[in-house]
Amino acid sequence: PERFAATTDTLYLVSQEGPGSAAPLVAALTAAILDSAVADAGHTAGGRLPVPLVLVLDEAANVCRIRSLPDKYSYYGGMGIVITTVLQSYAQGVQAWGEAGIRKMWSAANVKIYLGGVSERGFLDDVSALIGDHRVQEISQTHSQGAQWSRSIGSRSERILDVADLAALPLGRALVFSSGNRPTLIRTLPWWEGPHADAIRASMAAHGPGIDLPTPR
């Protein structure tokens, strides 16, 4: 871990969940690399790594459950350590780190991305509140016995995206929450439609026999 943290190399740690899983080993090795990177950053004048360390913790709750992650999440960025934590749902994060722990991570993250497919009402209501409200114009007309009409114009506040909208977010869309900016609705780009699709297919064919490769549309 000490040697790797000081290099520009790439390390892939792969495991499955369930009995006999190497997940504890993956978590321990990742934590050791993080500790080494923190120590290296402490030896620099600015307290930051000269070359950022980027960790992409896919399925973090299943195969890379580092207990201390919530408590350290907020200051890693200042050391040049960039962490992306990928979870299937907010509830999965609660199961792994507890309600307080996952809230720490959610609050400390400079960029948060919601990809849909979640039906947790409490979480979705929080997300809806972060997106905010907009004003909806209302026009009403009344008719009196004297055959006179009166018209009034007002407005009311309405959620931009309510819980039902977020639960039904279409495939290929995502919401991005970044520090200092309003939430943004984006279109995602599947890897098989991107510029590196051929290289990825070749790698999967060579190193992942039996994998069903997506067919371009």
Language-model segments: residues:
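Conserved ATP-driven motor cores of ASCE-family P-loop NTPases powering translocation/secretion/packaging/pilus
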Residues: 73-178
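P-loop NTPase motor domains
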Residues: 1-81, 164-185, 190, 194-195, ...
